[in-house]
From Swiss-Prot:
Domain notes: The N-terminal domain interacts with the head of the 30S subunit; the C-terminal domain interacts with the body and contacts protein S4. The interaction surface between S4 and S5 is involved in control of translational fidelity.
One GO term of the biological process aspect: translation
NCBIfam families to which the protein is assigned, alphabetical: rpsE_bact (TIGR01021)
Domain of life: Bacteria
UniProt xrefs under Pfam families: Ribosomal_S5, Ribosomal_S5_C
Keywords, sorted A to Z: Ribonucleoprotein, Ribosomal protein, RNA-binding, rRNA-binding
Highest classification ranks of the organism: Bacteria, Pseudomonadati, Pseudomonadota, Gammaproteobacteria, Pseudomonadales
UniProt-recorded name of the protein: Small ribosomal subunit protein uS5
Gene that encodes it: rpsE
One Gene Ontology MF term: structural constituent of ribosome
Amino acid sequence: MSNHDQKRDEGYIEKLVQVNRVAKTVKGGRIFTFTALTVVGDGKGRVGFGRGKSREVPAAIQKAMEAARRNMIQVDLNGTTLQYAMKSAHGASKVYMQPASEGTGIIAGGAMRAVLEVAGVQNVLAKCYGSTNPVNVVHATFKGLKGMQSPESIAAKRGKRVEEII
């Protein structure tokens, strides 16, 4: 598992989460291809992930980066942390994320850390249970972040003031 990151001219932070070699067996032998999993974010709440496949590693990474830029979501952050603690799952991967006080840093492993870093989360406590397959962990993390709402948006939906729901 590689952790490659770079800044692009659009202001996005790009991280390579995983490159995997897969083999297709045919009559004449094996055909090797590569898959790449990447996450892209602006460090201010916009984040996306993508997967790319190709015969060459750089082409797979490029396809994954383009897919990640196309599939970006907006996350409502509470400053540099999450709004509230949450659980999420995808397949056999389960993730738990909770907000942390200023100065805590990102306490998360592997694929979750990459997603949270590019999203702009700087203080969080996170744990992955079950399968640690990076693809499923990234999916589960995204499900949790996508469902997170700010108290202001919840109050607006209910037609109440923020003080009434907190």
